[in-house]
Amino acid sequence: YQAKDIFRKFGIPVPKGRVATSVDEAVKASQDLPGPPWVVKAQVHAGGRGKGGGVRVVKSLDELKQATSDILGRPLVTKQTGPEGKKVHQVLIEEGVNIDREFYLAVVIDRSKARPVMIFSQAGGMEIEEVAARSPELVLKQFIDPKVGWMPFQAKNLVYSLDPLPGADTVKEILSLMGALYRVFTTQDCSLAEINPLVITREGKALAIDGKINIDDNALVRQKELKALDDHR
């Protein structure tokens, strides 16, 4: 949820959600959100939560209570946590979303070229390393000159590669979202700013369903607010 809070500040649309630390809080959170359905998401500083059982779609209050009880207080094991896992102290309760299409979008430092690169793929919701190994043609890149920044033509190069191409309003939303993600990357001193998946809803809206931000450790001295978000548990 911390990454989504940052996304929201930069105008990146995210689903409505509330954080809960108990079953009772989860129930109260759901009452402030559209639904059912809702989505219960384990909150740990690691990716791959869906495959680890840390993301559950629920269609009733009873299912929400059960999912929250199952997740809270237990270690979540993913590829990024190691075999010991990370204990879950919080869950995020989110509104359900009618998903039409899923994409992967990220800005990361390419160390071989010593510059940022925007990565975009139609294979959203999956580990991008797996996609790159299996279907490299699905992973598109635009390298960014730090002196110039993210340019509109680069966003169009990525978005207009989509087949089928979304509607005009949706295209505008994605183009704007790409620029916003690059601003997150630069202003927050990120080594990674990732949206996975970025979705188009059945209503034609672009939404950042899940996100991850890694901050360059060398920049934490000037990112005191972000340093305070670190979870040492």
Tell what function each PLM region has.
Residues 1-7, 33-50, 78-99, 105, ...:
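ATP-grasp fold ATP-binding core
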Residues 1-37:
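A conserved helix-loop-beta module that forms one wall/lid of the active-site cleft
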Residues 14-17, 40-68, 104, 126-128, ...:
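Glycine-rich phosphate-binding loop of ATP-grasp-fold ATP-dependent ligases
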Residues 78, 82-144:
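Hydrophobic alpha-helical hairpins/lids featuring a short glycine-rich hinge
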Residues 154-198:
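A long amphipathic alpha-helix within ATP-dependent nucleotide-binding catalytic cores
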